Amino acid sequence: MNHHRVIIDTDPGQDDAVAILLALASPKQIDLLGVTAVAGNVPLELTQKNARIICELAGRNDVKVFSGCHEPIERKLVTAEHVHGKTGLDGTDLPYPQMPLQEIHAVDFIIHSLLNNPTKTITICALGPLTNIASAFKKDPRVVARVKNIILMGGAYFEVGNITPAAEFNIFVDPEAAKIVFESGVVLTVIPLDVTHKALTSVKRVEAFRALGTPVGKAVAEWTNFFERFDKEKYGSMGAPLHDPCVIA
């Protein structure tokens, strides 16, 4: 069984939360080096807090969480509170995190990790706008050749967009960052809306999480119930697409 050294770059988001929990529940497959927060679904102040809330929910206070870029490279931040609620994790109430935020900036952590590990041994799982990753590539171009691969949720090929008729949210928020990453030469696995709109939740699956009777199971059920209302209203689907967990899977 392959064991992957991973940095998760994220803007939590209920579906980001499920993705992070999946990674934390897979220690035999994933060696999680750290979680880097970026502004996206909600502002950075909330995404870095949400990342720590998720780790504490899983009982993983040992995970290092880093705060990154608070706005896109060249434009104003667009957020998605209309989907994720004002906190980004609306749907259930969880306590303010007690675990510390790391002092080093997320961009510097990405650079440090890539320069101080054997080349092409680190996978970056990108769940949000690509601002942190592109900023690392710009700040120290040496790291580009050291990335094993990037698996990212973003874009839409034949599927309609989820922020404009043509655009997917993560790419739309920072297209300049996306251009840097897509033109970098790093091996990319892109998971667009064409894929994630086929990975839908269902009442049966949501209730299976709730039936676990654990804090994680309850939170996942409540988050999913909140999150799926947007897609039910917009697309008429029977459940919500689990965009970001597809990256970890």
Predicted regions and their residues:
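N-terminal acidic, glycine/proline-rich low-complexity segments
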Residues: 1-249
